[in-house]
Amino acid sequence: VGKLQERRRFLGAAVGGLLVPALPACGGGDDAPPTPTPPEPVPATQITQAIAQLDKLAADLMASSRVPGMAVAVVRGSQTVYAKGFGRRLVTDAAPVDADTVFQLASVSKSLGATVVARQVGRGGIGWETPVRTQLPWFALADADVSAAVTIGDLYAHRSGLPDHAGDRLEDMGYDRQQVLTRLRFVPLHPFRAVYAYTNFGMTAAAEAVAAAAGIDWATLSEQALYQPLGMTRTSSRYADFAARDNRAAGHVRVSGNWVPGTARMPDAQSPAGGVSASVNDMAKWLAMLLGKGEFAGQRVVDAAALAPALSPQMQSNPPSSGRPAGYYGYGFNVGTTELGLTSLNHSGAFALGSATSFMAVPELDLAIVTLTNAQPIGVPETLSAQFFDLVQYGAIRRDWAKLYGDALAPLLEPEGRLVGQPRPANPLPARALSAYTGLYRNDYYGPLQIADQGGTLVMTLGGAPLVVPLSHWDGDVFTFTLDNENAMPGTISQAAFSSDRVWLEYYDHEGLGIFVR
């Protein structure tokens, strides 16, 4: 469990954690950030030279990582000064990636969504401090006071008290957005506004409140509020739009060292947090708006005062360690400073089923980069951002970023379960008659679980899809099952331990919610 949470936490703030030490928080009761040391000036020619090296940097990363495809764009001032594709959309097809190839953004969607919210805040009628329940009367968390008080900003800063990635495993089981959100009331909470815990569905609830206030669904709101005004014609918050595009990048996973097409990732349930797809040409328009403090091509798209809180430290996301300052999160953005004292805005995105993305913007330099790949997260987009901004600031790459990110991610992509790597018992105790285990089991959070004897094999059926999984006997009343999905790495093994009228499913026991009662 801890390994998975660490993997997700790293991916949620990957660039912020290693590349850019962040400013102290001004939320959660901490002191306001001190004024940073005035940054050293960066020569304009040094930026130009860094851009000129991107072709080689990208080609070298493609060669060393062997990721099938990648697209990169750089915005300087209000202009896209670099936009290029590398490699293939699909490893088994020669069709090339270009700057218009559409990729799934994964958690970079959070930053785009935050600018949709900022646009609505600027239009009035809703604010970052608006309680979610004013727009979603049905919304509830485990504590009545928190349910009434939690705001759009709290959920966008990951400080609601919901635990790390609450709701994600419900999505893997086939539950839709509404079904996941209504079940969050069963999840035990951390102290309100005191603990940072990265969630997709907490943020999705906040976005749903904003959409409700606008009277339209989130995907349509995003289109009308952001994508259309910016001319992002190849961007959508609907999976069906991504799937229908001819020039799209397929996800890939690594099997025995080789990249192969992954299972399609359909993230509509958490669309505000992970469901956007876009090209780097479109992302460059969004980055130009970001650098322009809400202005694009001479037009005001997002109110600057409404956008500013999203781009300011709101919650400490990582404690200081190994000589690095703490990391901080705004509303949908990692907010930090580079070693030269320049403010940075960034986010990473990752689908274990085959997508890794990242952007970094430094407003004081009027400069931003975005990198999209169609492969499992191994640190490629973050490495390119780090290399590029090393060249921008210092004229040289100062660390082996590929090794830093690769080493940080490698152990975190391993399977989970106490029995992983364990030999089967040499002399296991026999199971009881299978009829002793069959029946309908109940769990408020995960819903009903059916255990049936199918030709001498126990099979469990659960979730909204539903998920149908055979059980294998391990020892006595303990059986096992395997999973391979967005949150369960290949090789994951879970125990299913029966006792009297209940069964404990190890994989689903996050926050102690893994007991199903018959």
What is each residue range found by the language model?
Residues G127-D143, L230:
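Short, glycine/proline-biased beta-turn/loop segments that scaffold the active-site neighborhood
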